[in-house]
Amino acid sequence: MTEEGPGIVSLGKLRRPRMLRLWGICRVQIFSAIFMLMSPAGVGAGAKDDFSLVHPLVTMEQLLWVSGKQIGSVDTFRIPLITTTPRGTLLAFAEARKMSTSDKGAKFIALRRSMDQGSTWSPTAFIVDDGETPDGLNLGAVVSDTTTGVVFLFYSLCAHKAGCQVASTMLVWSKDDGVSWSSPRNLSLDIGTEMFAPGPGSGIQKQREPRKGRLIVCGHGTLERDGVFCLLSDDHGVSWRYGGGVSGIPYGQPKRENDFNPDECQPYELPDGSVVINARNQNNYHCHCRIILRSYDACDTLRPRDVTFDTELVDPVVAAGAVATSSGIVFFSNPAHPEFRVNLTLRWSFSNGTSWRKETVQLWPGPSGYSSLTTLEGNVDGKDEAPQLYVLYEKGRNQYMESISLVKVSVYGTL
């Protein structure tokens, strides 16, 4: 891949923000914690993935960003994304909204990195700056190529057509685990100028056939290209094209309450090689719950007959987190409430998301918004570690956009 101009933004040029007081790790039942501490050593490092070992336990929480002009004079931090690079580095991203809480307006893309499994984080770096654009950038989706080690970050410009006429899908990438980034690449010549809002969340790289190695980034459109659809790359991110999509109903027309209108979405791969896309149900069609789409050809097509509704995943119309581990555990996070963005809850499934375990972990009872998930599995720094789950989410006491917080969860419940 040829980088377009120097465009390298080095971390470390910004001073470390002052330490912030935590709002508290969510409560964990004492007897459950004691039981897990007394469990056999087999559930620690080197343990074989086994559903019977899964007892998610929060082991750490810390704030990464606080709104209110406390970091770099940024008014509001929103839209959290988190990913694990092929080398095991954690990268956390957010929209840094310069002047207001609005989805429109000028922004930075904020980044923090962790190289010690989330214990410590680099100072905030602003890796993209849209200047004073009236309808600036919007995150976004991040995906890594395990073969090349390159991390790709997608975002949109002029998504709302406010003071501008042409939407663009933009891409930056890093070859060194987020230390430096390329200049932005405009994908309009490849995919056109129909508005495509990636994610928000993570893309995936197919780990199984069909199309093993394919990069997939899913998102949603507006009236120009209605519904949920995906970007695909079969050459390690050199070129991108549109794959399958599912349109809203009525197509190309303004939607009303209870119309079918899939929106922000998160893909993950199942053990059989199929791809599930967990989507926001923008107009509460059928239920106050999640729309589930499934593709059996690596998102070349998305068929209406493969669309279902998960009534167990009650949802207040929000961007949620979803991820599948290498052993087939599916995790899901959202504000578990039919109307309000409160009660950020973690759920998990041993049946590919067709059913969910009755036990849950409440991460925050109060105002909570968008969330993003990633896992750290297998060999880390030469050690075979038990799997860890990371939840990056919007958290507040009065409003969910007051901060962005990181929770670390031990999948096997070990400290």
Swiss-Prot record:
This is Sialidase-1. One of its GO terms (biological process) is oligosaccharide catabolic process. SUPFAM superfamilies: Sialidases (SSF50939). A C-terminal internalization signal (YGTL) appears to allow the targeting of plasma membrane proteins to endosomes. Pfam families: BNR_2. It is a peripheral membrane protein. It comes from Bos taurus. Its EC number is 3.2.1.18. The active site is at D103 (proton acceptor), Y370 (nucleophile), E394. The keyword Iron does not apply. BNR repeats lie at residues 112-123, 172-183, 231-242, 347-358.
